Amino acid sequence: MDQDALISKEDSEVEREASGGRESLSDVIGFLDAVLSSEPTDIGGDRSWLHNTINTLQRPGSTHRAKGEGEGEVSTSSTQDNRSGEESRVSGGTSEPEAEAHARNVDKQNIHWATGRGASTDSVPQDLGNGRDSGILEDPPNEGGYPRSGAEDENREMAANPDKRGEDQAEGLPEEIRRSAPLPDEGEGRADNNGRGVESGSPHSARVTGVLVIPSPELEEAVLQRNKRRPANSGSRSLTPVVVPSTRSPPPDHDNSTRSPPRKPPTTQDEHTNPRNTPAVRIKDRRPPTGTRSAPDRPTDGYPTHPGPETDATKKGA
């Protein structure tokens, strides 16, 4: 019994769900039929009144007729239809004061900047909202009446006459150096630099081209005296030759090509017998006076011969 009751309840729930699904499907199908049965001309009807300008005025009681989707014609007042136009008009009215306030702020900033720099407000023109390029003009008019500088006038003349520079170069004239100091006087510069600059430093001047200034004798003497008074540098090496005491310079008429090599001084007998303990003693050169004959045992160079054992034996035998 209980199982039969449960089965009957389940069957009733399934039937309800199926009936609910059928009702929802029937509603959707009916809605689609209503949409498809409507004429396409009604969907794309005349809506030109939505694009009317804001300034156009309509009668307060004028109404517009519109068709809904299967609901028939509905009358709407002009105030409701033009609500979007009023909103746009309000937004436009609020945007205009904001633009004016922004322009006033920009003008105040320009005036403050110009007064701080000591210039007039006309020197900084501004274009707001016209679509043109804003900024400083290339050649602003001289409305204040201030005199222009010479460099600007020269630049304007050269810009107006571009062939002038080419003519000057073709004639061989030097190009002028603008904003440069004038050349000093020749006599004044000669007295100031003490003879160090005898030529002008500017090669572009046509007055000194090919001219050499010859210094005077007085100027040369002054330069020589100044160089003599200048102290010698202690760090420089001396140019005097260093004389070695052990060497002798030859006489001026002596020929170096015929000079004989230096000879070794003779040694005594004591040096041969005991050269380590006995110091070497050099015999003085005893040259005979001029006009006398030299001894047979004395050589021509004045040095004595070595007294060996043979000479001693001959002397004893004699």
UniProtKB/Swiss-Prot annotation:
Chain intervals with Polar residues compositional bias: 50-61
Protein name, entry field: Protein W
Endpoints of the signal sequence: none
Sequence ranges of Basic and acidic residues compositional bias: 7-20, 99-110, 150-168
Encoding gene, per UniProt annotation: P/V/C
Ranges where the record places region Disordered: 1-24, 38-318
Chain positions found as Phosphoserine: 249, 257, 260
Note: The P/V/C gene has two overlapping open reading frames. One encodes the P/V/W proteins and the other the C/Y proteins.
Keywords from the named record: Phosphoprotein
